[in-house]
Amino acid sequence: MRDDNCIFCKIANGEIPSRTLYEDEEFRVIMDLGPATRGHALILPKEHYANLFEIPADTAARAMQVAKKVGTQIVEKLGANGLNVVQNNGECAGQTVPHFHIHLIPRYQDDGQHILWKPGKLSDEEMDAIRDQILADQES
C-alpha cells in the first residue's frame, strides 16, 4: 500500500526525482538532501509503513540486507572510517517523516558529527522491574 500524501512514497516510487544509489522491486536508496556527512543515504521501502512497528518482519530483514550491501559500497568507495545505521521511530526519537526509513551515515575521522547519549544508572531492582514489565504476558 502507498500513501499518496507521503513524500517518501513519491520519492521511492520515482514520482519525485532523487539521486538514486540502489533500487530493486521493494526499495530505493537515495542520497539525503540534508546530509550529516558526505555520502549520507536513505533506504526507503516503496510500500508505506509509518515506522518499525508497522513494517513486516521479512521486509525489515530485507531492508537490513540492502543496508549491508549499500553501506559496504559507500564505505569502500568514499573511504569512510565507519558507518552509522540509524532508524528512528516517532517524533520524540527524531523521526521527521512518518515513513519507515534507514539512514546510512558514513563516518570520517573528525567529521564533527556525534551520535551519542548520556549513559544513565539504574539499580538492580529497577533493571529487574523494567525487564519484568517488558516480559509480562509475553508468549514464549
Can you say where each PLM-predicted feature lies in the sequence?
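HIT superfamily nucleotide-processing domains
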Residues: M1-S140
